[in-house]
């Protein structure tokens, strides 16, 4: 078959396959055109779920007579004129495809009048070449679009339309979403001659909340927490439901970027992460949020239906949204779940060969840290030292040949040498080869002295303590993309001011003003922690203890920091041990109590022998 240019109607129908998914898609495109035209009132009439009639009437600026035919042509628009405009889009529409695509799969009539005209004009396209006919009509200033018999000429598409009730439900949802972002526009929705929705234009905050309640329900309004978060050219405002409200309203999620309705994965992930220790995995947060960003920093031309965007600084936007939502939840006093057990995906098998020590696992993005149990500041200062539990069971105890100990003494420099753990020879370079992971928390090692069991969480704590010891030059502060605003009491603020030199040595940058404390930088090992909980607890610890040294503070951080792995796998254990061997050679030569335990395999083998 020879290459040829497609006829206009066929080309438009192909484009309609992306733009016009169902009647609700038509309503969305046409209402957005009305909003771009500056309309303050929009009336939507629907018949038979949109299959028979979709009529959109507005009081916008209208379309001039000599532009009506062009309005129904492909790639014709008044919203952008150059590539620079495309890179900073502020209108809802910009491609110039909607009207041409819709007219190719329906009988579309466009009637419009501008304020400068004394009469209105009507245009419609017909035939294979989509020729446009223009004739006089009666109409006030504004535009009316009628879409009759949607998909009449594409039976396959019409066959896949759902019931009238289902299609209208989708249309109703589109109108709800638009009404939530354009409070200044009056909107009415009629179905089969019956008025279904009517939203009056509102201006003040009280009226906005009434419209919010009318759309989202009084249940959401009663649990709504208002958010107003600003950083540079980023702005986040709207409402989020408290955890108890979110559990009952998990399907209520509305998000907008520069006034455009979105279903963006990055935004949803940031919001879900903010609720992670409040809701767990079984519930979804409920929210109505509006993100304002410099149009040059976001690309909206990445999705056929414009449901997704691409941020040029995605990590900055993610952290900004996360910090904003976390702050309002903390200020409201929302309770944290006591403990969250998250199921981890099955890990792929990794080869047993150890990579050379020297690779720093902090240099690669770390998995999300397991949430720590919530605690008040006062209780956290008096928290008991971590208790490392060994697995119970007769077979396990026989294998280890040691009595089970329920507690480990506090970490101290002396504990590295004063213990009854097996001492390795002075020339030992490693713990040995990782054979397997036992019960997701221990590594079974094979070394020169035989088999040994190593507690991975204990090794991780020792490593973190070594990484947090500042030395003579201090730790390098790592600036946060979004400074964290902390809520501190007087004792914590006083401790921060008193220990400013120690905090600088630890790489922690705090800025105090009259009302707030901003955390601007932390050392690299703390970047993955929940800083809004950890730093206030640290200041509380300093308030309760005088003359704390950098070593003691590093030890405290190592104990209080959440583990980066709730369930360890083979490759993670290898990476951890390589770092421990590089940074903590003393642990290899003389492991402290609770870190390493020899396994007497001979006894187990003898028990299996038969005479």
Swiss-Prot record:
> Carries keyword DNA damage?
yes
* Keyword Nucleotidyltransferase included in the entry's annotation: no
Q: Tell me which CDD domains the record gives.
A: HATPase_MutL-MLH-PMS-like (cd16926), MutL_Trans_MutL (cd03482)
Q: Which InterPro entries match?
A: DNA_mismatch_repair_CS (IPR014762), DNA_mismatch_repair_MutL (IPR020667), DNA_mismatch_S5_2-like (IPR013507), HATPase_C_sf (IPR036890), MutL/Mlh/PMS (IPR002099), MutL/Mlh/Pms-like (IPR038973), MutL_C (IPR014790), MutL_C_dimsub (IPR042120)
Residue ranges with Low complexity bias? 363-380
Query: What GO biological process, any one, is recorded here?
Result: mismatch repair
Pfam families with a match to the protein in the record: DNA_mis_repair, HATPase_c_3, MutL_C
Name the segments for region: Disordered.
Answer: 353-387
GO terms under cellular component: mismatch repair complex
A GO molecular-function term, please?
mismatched DNA binding
Q: Which SMART domains does its entry note?
A: DNA_mis_repair, MutL_C
Q: Give the record's keywords alphabetically.
A: DNA damage, DNA repair
What superkingdom does the record give?
A: Bacteria
Q: Which family does it belong to?
A: Belongs to the DNA mismatch repair MutL/HexB family.
General function of this protein: This protein is involved in the repair of mismatches in DNA. It is required for dam-dependent methyl-directed DNA mismatch repair. May act as a 'molecular matchmaker', a protein that promotes the formation of a stable complex between two or more DNA-binding proteins in an ATP-dependent manner without itself being part of a final effector complex.
Name of the protein? DNA mismatch repair protein MutL
Provenance organism: Erwinia tasmaniensis (strain DSM 17950 / CFBP 7177 / CIP 109463 / NCPPB 4357 / Et1/99)
Q: Which gene encodes it?
A: mutL
């Amino acid at each position: 078959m020879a290459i040829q240019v497609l006829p206009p109607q066929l080309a438009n129908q192909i484009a309609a396959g992306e733009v016009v998914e169902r009647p609700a898609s038509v309503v969305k495109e046409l209402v957005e055109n009305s909003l771009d035209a500056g309309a303050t009132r929009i009336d939507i009439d629907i018949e038979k779920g949109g299959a028979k009639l979709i009529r959109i009437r507005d009081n916008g600026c209208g379309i001039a007579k000599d532009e009506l035919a062009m309005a129904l042509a492909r790639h014709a628009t008044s919203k952008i004129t150059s590539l620079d405009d495309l890179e900073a889009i502020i209108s809802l529409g910009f491609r110039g495809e909607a009207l041409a695509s819709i007219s190719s799969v329906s009988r579309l009539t466009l009637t419009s009048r501008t304020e400068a005209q004394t009469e209105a004009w009507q245009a419609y396209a017909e035939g294979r070449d989509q020729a446009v006919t223009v004739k006089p009509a009666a109409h006030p200033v504004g535009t009316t679009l009628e879409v009759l018999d949607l998909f009449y000429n594409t039976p396959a598409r019409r066959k896949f339309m759902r019931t009238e009730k289902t299609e209208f439900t989708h249309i109703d949802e589109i109108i709800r979403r638009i009404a939530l972002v354009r409070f200044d526009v009056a909107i009415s929705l009629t179905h089969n001659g019956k008025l279904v929705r009517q939203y009056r234009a509102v201006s003040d905050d009280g009226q906005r909340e009434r419209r919010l309640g009318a759309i989202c329900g009084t249940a959401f309004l009663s649990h709504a927490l208002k958010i107003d978060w600003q950083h540079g050219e980023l702005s986040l405002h709207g409402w989020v439901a408290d955890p108890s409200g979110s559990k009952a309203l998990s399907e209520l999620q509305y998000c907008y970027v520069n006034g455009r309705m979105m279903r963006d994965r990055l935004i949803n992930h940031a919001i879900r992460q903010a609720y992670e220790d409040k809701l767990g995995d079984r519930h979804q947060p409920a929210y109505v949020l509006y993100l304002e960003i410099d149009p040059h920093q976001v690309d909206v031309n990445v999705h056929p239906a414009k449901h997704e965007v691409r941020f040029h600084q995605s990590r900055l936007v993610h952290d900004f949204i996360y910090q904003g939502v976390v702050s309002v939840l903390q200020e409201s006093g929302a309770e944290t779940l006591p403990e969250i057990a998250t199921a981890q995906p099955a890990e792929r098998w990794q080869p047993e060969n150890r990579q050379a020590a020297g690779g720093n696992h902090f240099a690669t993005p770390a998995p999300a840290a397991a949430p720590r149990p919530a605690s008040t500041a006062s209780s956290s200062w008096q928290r008991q030292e971590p208790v490392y539990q060994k697995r119970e069971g007769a077979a396990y105890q026989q294998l280890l040949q040691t009595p089970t100990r329920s507690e480990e003494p506090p970490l101290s420099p002396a504990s590295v040498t004063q213990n009854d753990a097996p001492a390795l020879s002075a020339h030992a370079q490693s713990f040995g080869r990782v054979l397997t992971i036992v019960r997701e928390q221990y590594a079974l090692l094979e070394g020169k002295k035989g088999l040994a069991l190593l507690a991975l969480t204990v090794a991780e704590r020792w490593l973190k303590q070594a990484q947090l010891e500042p030395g003579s030059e201090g730790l390098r502060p790592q600036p946060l993309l979004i400074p964290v605003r902390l809520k501190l009491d007087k004792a914590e603020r006083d401790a921060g001011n008193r220990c400013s030199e120690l905090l600088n040595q630890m790489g922690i940058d705090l800025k105090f003003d009259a009302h707030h404390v901003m955390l601007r930088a932390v050392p690299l090992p703390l970047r993955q922690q929940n800083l809004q909980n950890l730093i206030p607890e640290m200041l509380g610890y300093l308030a309760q203890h005088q003359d704390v040294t950098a070593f003691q503070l590093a030890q405290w951080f190592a104990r209080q920091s959440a583990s980066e792995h709730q369930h360890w796998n083979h490759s993670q254990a290898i990476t951890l041990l390589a770092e421990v061997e590089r940074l903590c050679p003393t642990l290899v030569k003389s492991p402290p109590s609770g870190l390493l335990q020899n396994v007497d395999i001979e006894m187990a083998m003898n028990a299996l022998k038969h005479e």
